[in-house]
Amino acid sequence: MTMESRKGKVIPFAQSATFYMKRGARDMERNDILGALHRYRLAQQAAPDEAAPTLALAEILSYMQRYEESNRLILQLMARGVGTPECHFGLACNYFGMREYDYAVESLENYLDSDPDGPFAADAEDFLDLLDDDLAMLEIAGLMSDADYDANAACVYARHLMDAGDFAAAVSLLKSECQHAPDSVMLKNQLTMAYFCGGERGKAAGVVQELMDSGRDDILTRCNYALLCLARNERQEADAAIDGLLKSDTESPEALHGIAVLLVETDRYSDALNILERLMRIVPYDEQVLHMLGYCRYRLKDFSGAQSCYKRLLRIDPEDTIAKYYLSESRVTDADERRMRSHWVVQYQVPFQEAFKRLAQINRSLLLPEAEQRERWKNDRHFVDLLRWALTLPDVRVKKSILSLLYLFKDERAEAMLRDFLLRPEQPDEQKRMVFGMLKDMGAQEPYMAYLNGRWLQGRVNFLQFSYPLPTPYEAIIGLLLEDMGGMRDQRCLTAAAGIYKRYIESLHQKF
């Protein structure tokens, strides 16, 4: 037998979830976090309706401080009716990391109600005690009074509104909260950013000046001041402010991130690199931090270092087409330095030219016959990843087009992407309400988990049905019931309220 004839093909074969779970546990023992993440993803894909692989994946994502991604996995598991009491404990850990403390308490109470003698019962009790301990929360989160908690909750919601592009709503919310807590620096700093991002720079400057004149400014206030100086082309004042910020020994991720952005925007890449390396010790799996680190290395002509950042991002999320783009750019420039781009997008998104090219590619696909579209959806991984990427764009028209296309496909993958859309705080409520109807028409199992109107909720479409149409104000009450009472608590609360409202409507005998 010759050497040639002895060569054979390596035939891949699917492994069980148990196999990948064992490999993932072994990686964790070796402290190979990204290796374990990969194994647990494979385990979850092999058995998506089993609780153990999903919870293992959610747990490691929580460890990596990717709390929202972890929560989406747990909530989708619960929506499929295969969740376990441990899901509530996992949600509590994530809500705590997301600074959603009321939801953390609610989830812990749900866990203890569903499994009072469960494996995490003692931990849940201790967790609740910590959340009720003013001194502990002051040390951990900088919160002491009820006003502090209210301000924190308002800032969390305002950031979600800003991520969704609704700056006016964020401003309105924060102005209202500032009336109740006029001395809150946290609220004023967030209001500054809401004004700035909404194009009202004069009002943003007014808030910053008020804080600085009163001596209540903090490091985030000074970051905002430097940002406003840059926006007004006052480079000398901005540089002086940034020099002052560099003397800070803060370990606050939010403050360090603000300083890093300013340094990148002013082309001070070496200084930015130092700040980002400090940040990496605190949030080593944060995509925005890794992207800025990659960009700084790229600008400093450390192309292999830049590539390592995007390779790391792709190990975290193999479907991340933004990381794929920047990895490709780094490789091209490494091979030929003359092709070095003068500027990338500091925000974690592809540049406009690349976004335009991708959207043109999607539009060409939309012109294909439906059968060809379905074929691409089924077999073209790149096409699927492009659609997922397009939903991250701020343009509402793009979102509507992609959501309509997913609705057309009506399969398990489309349903999963629609459910995922509902759970993303940065996505607009109007489109989420449309997705509720799409899922209902597709026959997707209820309840539908969502972040809607600033609340995490689980709801059922048409959970109140009548044989006759209701006037708009009465119909709106149903939506309010869903949004205001449909949180993660026991569904019986919503059912009881719905029953009361139904009896009231029926008592009117259609005389509205």
Give the predicted meaning of each segment.
Residues 22, 56, 90, 123-127, ...:
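Canonical tetratricopeptide repeat
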Residues 29, 63, 97, 127-130, ...:
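Register position in tetratricopeptide repeats
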Residues 15-46, 63, 146-180, 190, ...:
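Alpha-helical segment of the N-proximal tetratricopeptide repeat
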Residues 96-133, 247-251, 281, 303-339, ...:
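TPR/TPR-like (Sel1-like) alpha-helical repeat modules
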